[in-house]
Amino acid sequence: MLIENVKIVNSPFWTINPAFCDNVTVHGVTIYNPSKDPKGPNTDGINPSSCRNVRISDCFISVGDDCITIKSGRDADGRKYGKACENITITNCVMLSGHGGVVIGSEMSGGVRRVTISNCVFDGTDSGIRLKSSRGRGGVVEELRVDNIV
């Protein structure tokens, strides 16, 4: 799947949400969601869920929730399918406002593995990188690498 050089404004919910995909590239994408009120609920930017071999590069994301969220299923369903989100590269991105720049979870019952975040700028987010889960959710996070972030 290739999503490249598009601008998305005011998506009503999670903006780009590939699920159970292999070989996903999101490049040169601009997301303003919402464009005027940076506090809109559930206005995530890019949310790969149970995907493998994902590259997110050279994106500009300004949202009211999380800019990029890595997911892999929720509770019993996530454990039942057991498909991790893995081999994720996030590089050369600018993330503004929102709760988190890059967030792992909270829907991560299938696990998250081999994530690299590099050369990214977080400006005005509540947190740059955030790991979150809920009681009883389960799932592992393995091999998280972070390099040259501001």
Which residues are covered by each model-predicted region?
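Extracellular/periplasmic carbohydrate-active domains that bind, remodel
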Residues: 1-150
